[in-house]
A protein has these predicted regions:
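Cleavable N-terminal export/targeting peptides
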Residues: 1-24
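Outer membrane beta-barrel transmembrane domains
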Residues: 162-197
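Residues that define the transmembrane beta-barrel architecture of outer-membrane proteins
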Residues: 23, 43-47, 72-76, 109-113, ...
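Outer-membrane beta-barrel initiation region
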Residues: 20-54
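Transmembrane beta-strand segments that form the barrel wall of outer-membrane beta-barrel proteins
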Residues: 27-35, 57-68, 89-101, 124-136, ...
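Short loop/turn motifs that connect adjacent beta-strands in outer-membrane beta-barrel proteins
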Residues: 19-24, 86, 154-164, 192-205, ...
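Detector for outer-membrane/organellar transmembrane beta-barrel domains
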Residues: 106-174
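Outer-membrane beta-barrel "beta-signal"
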Residues: 154, 189, 195, 216-228
């Protein structure tokens, strides 16, 4: 799996000649009423900063989540990704604060390494994610599950708002998603309104609903984003 992902990344980099040749950077932060990820609640009110750079379709970004509740786990993720004409592939290192950051020992680390591949058709995007190393969940045999998740997202515009409809599911058993087999874990609808301040500052505000049929949960989400 590792060799396949690295081969895809190297091949993608070699075909990037026609992409933008300027280095870009992103700094931003989301403020969310509760931290919902792939249909699972991972925290309450949280700040979620991000920092990234990109060059010729290749990007390296960091993302974190810090909850206001002392019981919420702190999270720090790094993602290396490549995108070309709708196709995208990436590697993400997830880390949660229950363990030491520089502990990479097998069966001890709290890092999770995930690979993803997807395609954006414009009117619809599809993504597949698979854990390939680290603190992965277990299958029904008690072995590494290579926990996976796939997602379909459809953006549209209605009533002067930008909407996204999301369908996400887990294809097979894993304790990471509390799944005994194929199950739907994420059905979401979200609307975003971009407020423009003094004709140059943007303040997107979003709200929506996320349902997790597997867990029989329904969440309301609300937040805002800041970026420069």
């Amino acid at each position: 799996m590792k060799r396949l992902i690295m081969t895809l990344l190297l091949a993608a980099c070699m075909t990037a000649a026609g992409a933008k040749d300027k280095v870009g950077a992103t700094i931003g932060c989301d403020f969310v009423g509760q931290y919902i990820w792939r249909g699972q609640k991972l925290g309450n009110v949280s700040l979620q900063p991000t920092l990234g750079i990109d060059y010729k379709g290749i990007s390296l970004s960091s993302w974190g989540s810090v909850g206001f509740d002392s019981d919420d786990a702190k999270e720090l993720d790094f993602t290396l990704a490549y995108e070309l004409k709708g196709f995208n592939v990436g590697l993400t290192d997830y880390w949660f604060s229950e363990g030491n950051y520089f502990n990479y020992k097998a069966h001890q680390t709290t890092h999770v390494w995930e690979a993803n591949v997807g395609y954006d058709f414009g009117f619809l995007s599809v993504q597949w994610f698979t854990n390939f190393a680290g603190n992965d969940g277990l299958n029904r045999s008690g072995k590494r599950a290579y926990s996976s998740y796939f997602e379909i997202v459809a953006p549209f515009r209605l009533a002067k708002l930008d909407w996204t409809a999301t369908f996400g599911a887990v294809p097979y058993a894993t304790t990471s998603y509390d799944a005994n087999g194929f199950c739907v874990t994420n059905i979401s609808l979200r609307a975003t309104k971009d407020f423009i301040i003094k004709q140059k500052w943007h303040l997107p505000v979003f709200a929506g609903l996320t349902g997790n049929p597997r867990a029989e949960k329904l969440y309301i989400i609300f937040g805002t984003s800041f970026s420069i």
